[in-house]
């Protein structure tokens, strides 16, 4: 399968929505979205999933295309693994209405992971016909079907107080990433299905201080991440 077999224009891409920072997230930049002070009310007493936020390129895959968050087809050199090594093997398992979103870790961004077993980690699946984000259990099931990992899960359950949550986050942020070195942050979502209109009250993130955004200088000097067990 070559890149010419990928139809980049046949479907209008559905980009991954921006995620608000928790009110006290230290890594928020001036143009990032931030939650209100009472943001935790949307999550208190509800079943949630907290995942490690990996430092890569947000990428969407359908059964006919793959593209970056900006809706630009993945033609850059650090997306070669998506086009060549992943897309051909998963496209027939994705329905016409589904978009699989994940973190492309082929290129080192600001964190150099040293225990990666895959360059692509799934974190969400959207159904354009039903207009719903799949529940986390369905995302995990979908990942098994595609034989791809999800982003690491830190917690599943109910947290009743913001203090309890922050104690957990502070502990997790003091521990290494599942793939060595430091964590970029965490993402917390309601475990069930999420409608687009409920997005801002259903998912939130916490990002480490001094998080470095990629820019033109990074594009000129990027390097490939190492895998400990490259299955492709």
Indicate residue ranges for each PLM-predicted region.
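Core nucleotide-handling region used for phosphoryl-transfer chemistry
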Residues: 2-232
């Amino acid at each position: 399968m070559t890149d010419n077999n990928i139809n980049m224009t046949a479907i209008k891409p559905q980009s991954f929505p921006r995620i608000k920072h928790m009110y006290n997230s230290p890594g928020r930049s001036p143009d990032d979205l931030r939650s209100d002070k009472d943001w935790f009310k949307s999550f208190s007493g509800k079943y949630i999933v907290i995942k490690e936020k990996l430092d890569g390129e947000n990428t969407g895959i359908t059964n006919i295309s793959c593209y970056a968050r900006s809706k630009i087809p993945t033609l850059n050199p650090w997306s070669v693994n998506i086009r060549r090594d992943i897309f051909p093997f998963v496209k027939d398992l994705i329905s016409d209405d589904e978009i699989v979103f994940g973190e492309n870790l082929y290129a080192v961004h600001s964190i150099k992971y040293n225990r990666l077993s895959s360059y692509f980690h799934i974190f969400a699946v959207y159904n354009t016909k039903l207009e719903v984000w799949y529940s986390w259990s369905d995302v995990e099931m979908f990942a098994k079907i595609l034989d791809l990992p999800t982003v690491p899960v830190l917690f599943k359950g109910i947290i009743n107080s913001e203090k309890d949550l922050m104690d957990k986050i502070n502990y997790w942020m003091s521990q290494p990433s599942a793939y060595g070195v430091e964590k970029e942050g965490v993402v917390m979502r309601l475990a069930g299905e999420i409608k687009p209109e409920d997005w801002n009250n259903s998912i939130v993130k916490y990002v480490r201080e001094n998080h470095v955004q990629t820019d033109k200088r990074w594009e000129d000097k990027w390097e490939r991440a190492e895998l400990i067990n490259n299955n492709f």
